[in-house]
Amino acid sequence: MKAVILDTGCANLASLAFAVKRLGVEPLITREAADIRSADRIFLPGVGTAKAAMTALTERGLPELIREAHQPLLGICLGEQLLGRRSEETGGVDLLGLIDADVRQLNAPGLPLPHMGWNRVFPKFESPQAKLLFKNIEPGEW
């Protein structure tokens, strides 16, 4: 299997590569169109603000490649947010538009934002895609 980690310019690529290697797959970190198009799986990592990430993706010519991808694509952290239409962060920025949703700041008085750490998973989605995503995860698992 050819797994590609997109070189977004705004992510901890070594940490993700290590995690993928633990699954028995040697990932390729790249921004090359041919590598991305020939991948079996694509990882879209991200750290920082949506605006900075979209600027970095655009400078690397990645938005259209990501939008055209037909392979399974996993957005991690900010990478998942980038799949939406628009983020209200830093005054608003257009995103990749692969998911019909806007990214909005959580209204969580008294809770630290951003939240980092481990939480138990309690899926509440009934769509076929969500059921597939959570197929082997029981409610309450880490």
In which residue ranges do the predicted regions lie?
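Extreme N-terminal starter segment of soluble prokaryotic enzymes
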Residues: 1-4
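Short glycine-/small-residue-rich Rossmann-like dinucleotide-binding loops
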Residues: 10, 46-49
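Short glycine-rich hinge loops at helix-strand junctions in the catalytic core
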Residues: 24
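Short acidic low-complexity segments
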Residues: 27-38
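Short acidic/histidine-rich motifs immediately flanking catalytic phosphotransfer sites
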Residues: 36-46
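Cysteine-nucleophile active-site neighborhood
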Residues: 48-119
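Active-site oxyanion/phosphate-handling segment shared across diverse enzymes
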Residues: 118-142
